[in-house]
């Protein structure tokens, strides 16, 4: 099943957001890409506004996953996690990206343009697209506990 992806970033993540958006649009595993990020490096829209807009689309079922880029990947993760039902993670290595989906069923991947090189970011997104959570896994009960606490 091809994924519907929403992508966003603030001005500190604009360049990577643009490069990764193009990569996503060219990937056969992606049905559509919606960009809710800033329009340029001079656009001062704050990262919480971008992150919440993307996360809300995932929470409403308008997108399967979101990719968020800011300077560190931390602020967008904090903001996205304020949206009920969203599990957003900051990950800058393959293992963490894998576990974010396989163990935590995270729908939102966050990265920092100032923290990770572009080629690694591209490789991580490519890996992320191929991962799918198994609702029968040992981790499913833990994810259900998170959802129950949140009331999602």
From Swiss-Prot:
Superkingdom, natural source: Bacteria
Gene3D superfamilies in the cross-refs: Sugar-phosphate isomerase, RpiB/LacA/LacB (3.40.1400.10)
One Gene Ontology term from the biological process aspect of the record: carbohydrate utilization
Catalysed reactions, semicolon-separated: D-erythrulose 4-phosphate = D-erythrose 4-phosphate
Catalytic residues identified in the record: 70 (proton acceptor)
Catalytic class of the enzyme: isomerase
Gene null: resulting phenotype: Cells lacking this gene are totally unable to grow on L-threitol. Cells lacking both derI1 and derI2 are totally unable to grow on D-threitol or on erythritol.
A GO molecular function held by the record: intramolecular oxidoreductase activity, interconverting aldoses and ketoses
Pathway: Carbohydrate metabolism; erythritol degradation; Carbohydrate metabolism; D-threitol degradation; Carbohydrate metabolism; L-threitol degradation
Its biological purpose: Catalyzes the isomerization of D-erythrulose-4P to D-erythrose-4P. Involved in the degradation pathways of L-threitol, D-threitol and erythritol, that allow M.smegmatis to grow on these compounds as the sole carbon source.
Alphabetized PANTHER family for the sequence: RIBOSE 5-PHOSPHATE ISOMERASE, RIBOSE 5-PHOSPHATE ISOMERASE-RELATED
Recorded family membership: Belongs to the LacAB/RpiB family.
Name the record gives this protein: D-erythrulose-4-phosphate isomerase 2
Taxonomic source organism: Mycolicibacterium smegmatis (strain ATCC 700084 / mc(2)155) (Mycobacterium smegmatis)
């Amino acid at each position: 099943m091809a994924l519907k992806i929403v992508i966003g970033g603030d001005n500190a993540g604009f360049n990577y957001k643009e490069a990764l958006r193009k990569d996503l649009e060219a990937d056969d595993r992606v049905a559509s890409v919606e960009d809710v990020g800033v329009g340029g490096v001079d656009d001062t829209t704050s990262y919480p506004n971008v992150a919440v807009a993307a996360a809300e689309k995932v929470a409403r079922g308008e997108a399967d996953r979101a990719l968020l880029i800011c300077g560190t990947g931390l602020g967008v993760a904090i903001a996205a996690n304020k949206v009920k039902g969203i599990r957003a993670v900051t990950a800058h290595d393959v293992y963490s990206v894998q576990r974010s989906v396989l163990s935590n069923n995270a729908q939102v991947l966050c990265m920092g343009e100032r923290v990770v090189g572009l080629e690694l970011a591209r490789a991580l997104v490519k890996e992320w697209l191929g991962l799918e959570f198994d609702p029968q896994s040992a981790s499913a009960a833990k994810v259900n506990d998170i959802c129950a606490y949140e009331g999602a």
